[in-house]
Amino acid sequence: MSHFAPVALPHANRLINHGPTVLITSVFGAKRNVMAAAWSMPVEFSPPRVAVVIDKSTFSRELMTAHGGFGLCVPATAAMDLTYAVGSCSGRERDKFAHYNIQAAPGPALGVPIIEANCLAWMECRLIREPHTEDAYDTCFAEVVSAAADSRVFANGHWTLNDGNATLRSIHHLGGGLFAPAGEAVQARPLPPTRPG
């Protein structure tokens, strides 16, 4: 049974606001790919837009440019080894979905591969062509057109991370195959006003 529920687009950026490592999925014709990306972030609220760094020489970049969109999935700790594996090899040599037995379904808006197993959230992203930033900095911009998240940890536009769901945490790549899970969510309190002087 899937615990995934749609996320309202005004809240979609919150799915990656905390800087998790993500899985980028792409497809064009009969070719498909999945790769890991440590550098992604929201860049605009309305419409929701994201940026992700994907090297121009990668198979993923080729597919997403040809298709005009990509999937962005947030893996949980259970997918840490898989995330490292798909980020360490090229999809030009093998279909990583088949090789690693990754189950994916076409997204509802763009048809890009969406992964829910061992993931916390996903977004379908329509590529916004910015040739200068793509070529000079390998930074790709996209508009989020649909999103969903595991309702056990994301509901009403907010993450709910606590000791009761420690296995349902996003992962953050520290380099060299070392990852850290997201910590417990804590609420900031307003500070009292300061007096001049």
Question: Predicted regions: what is each one?
Answer:
Residues 1-197:
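Basic, polyanion-binding surface patches
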